[in-house]
Amino acid sequence: MCHGKIAPKSSSEFVVTSVGHGVFLQLVILCALLGDGLASVCPLPPEPENGGYICHPRPCKDPLTAGSVIEYLCAEGYMLKGDYKYLTCKNGEWTPAMEVSCHLIEDKETHALGVPALSIVASTASSVALILLLVVLFVLLQPKLKSFHHSRREQGVSGDQVSIMVDGVQVALPSYEEAVYGSSGHCMPPADPRVQIVLSEGSAPSGRNMPREQQLQGQEACSSAGGEDEAPGHSGLCEAWGSQGSETVMVHQATTSSWVAGSGSSRPTHKDTADSENSDIQSLLSLTSEEYTDDIPLLKEA
């Protein structure tokens, strides 16, 4: 203090003092920052065998400070043990604390793939067995089917009647012969009886065998057709044929007897006999003409 006044300090001392305080403050701040930084840095995370980790956000910083997040991954064919796979750096430690490891998953895949494989093999085997069974059944039943078809065809050709059900009523279908030849079947219709009468009347003794031959031919036709199954009207027509043949023979015999009677009418000793024969001939002619007229509608109906 000089003359009652405070003497000022020197400027050099003030500068040194202020610099010393500033440096000390900076050192304290730096130490605090370094301490916090060292305390927030986490060590490298454990890396599992057959696996690794990635950082979020990428890329990984060095060092890994607080707030850094890592995700664990496993190699192909391996799976991470546990469901949680993320670790976070807090206060220099990784949380949550857990053991990270990767293990094989081939056993599970083999077991999972084994069931579909077995089902595929079983379905294939069953389908092949079914196809073989169908082939065997077809081979065994083919002869029976052929014989059944052949028998049905023979029934259709031979003329056996086949019936069907129409509204609960059994209706008989016509056979092949009935559909083609009518109800007469194979029996051929006889010749016109009037022509036979004319031939028998105009024929000489040399024509006596003609009606009998025609009758034999008609009987042979009826006998050949009688061996097969026929319609009900077939036998009736053949009987009419036989009756007409016999009537023709009778007419022929009557005409021949009339011819003999005419040649001997000049004899006076047999006059009464000739008259009786002429009356018999007239009755026979009238009878045969009536019967032939009755038979003609029958032929038209056939």
Swiss-Prot record:
<dbReference type="GO" id="GO:0006974">
    <property type="term" value="P:DNA damage response"/>
</dbReference>
<keyword id="KW-0812">Transmembrane</keyword>
<keyword id="KW-0768">Sushi</keyword>
<dbReference type="GO" id="GO:0016020">
    <property type="term" value="C:membrane"/>
</dbReference>
<feature type="domain" description="Sushi">
    <location>
        <begin position="40"/>
        <end position="104"/>
    </location>
</feature>
<dbReference type="InterPro" id="IPR042866">
    <property type="entry name" value="SUSD6"/>
</dbReference>
<feature type="region of interest" description="Disordered">
    <location>
        <begin position="202"/>
        <end position="241"/>
    </location>
</feature>
<dbReference type="Pfam" id="PF00084">
    <property type="entry name" value="Sushi"/>
</dbReference>
<keyword id="KW-0043">Tumor suppressor</keyword>
<keyword id="KW-0472">Membrane</keyword>
<keyword id="KW-0732">Signal</keyword>
<feature type="transmembrane region" description="Helical">
    <location>
        <begin position="120"/>
        <end position="140"/>
    </location>
</feature>
<feature type="disulfide bond">
    <location>
        <begin position="74"/>
        <end position="102"/>
    </location>
</feature>
<feature type="compositionally biased region" description="Polar residues">
    <location>
        <begin position="256"/>
        <end position="267"/>
    </location>
</feature>
<feature type="signal peptide">
    <location>
        <begin position="1"/>
        <end position="39"/>
    </location>
</feature>
<feature type="region of interest" description="Disordered">
    <location>
        <begin position="256"/>
        <end position="302"/>
    </location>
</feature>
<dbReference type="InterPro" id="IPR000436">
    <property type="entry name" value="Sushi_SCR_CCP_dom"/>
</dbReference>
<keyword id="KW-1015">Disulfide bond</keyword>
<feature type="compositionally biased region" description="Polar residues">
    <location>
        <begin position="279"/>
        <end position="290"/>
    </location>
</feature>
<protein>
    <recommendedName>
        <fullName>Sushi domain-containing protein 6</fullName>
    </recommendedName>
</protein>
<feature type="disulfide bond">
    <location>
        <begin position="42"/>
        <end position="89"/>
    </location>
</feature>
<feature type="compositionally biased region" description="Polar residues">
    <location>
        <begin position="212"/>
        <end position="222"/>
    </location>
</feature>
<comment type="function">
    <text>May play a role in growth-suppressive activity and cell death. May be involved in the production of chemokine molecules in umbilical vein endothelial cells (HUVECs) cultured in THP1 monocyte LPS-induced medium. Plays a role in preventing tumor onset.</text>
</comment>
<dbReference type="InterPro" id="IPR035976">
    <property type="entry name" value="Sushi/SCR/CCP_sf"/>
</dbReference>
<keyword id="KW-1133">Transmembrane helix</keyword>
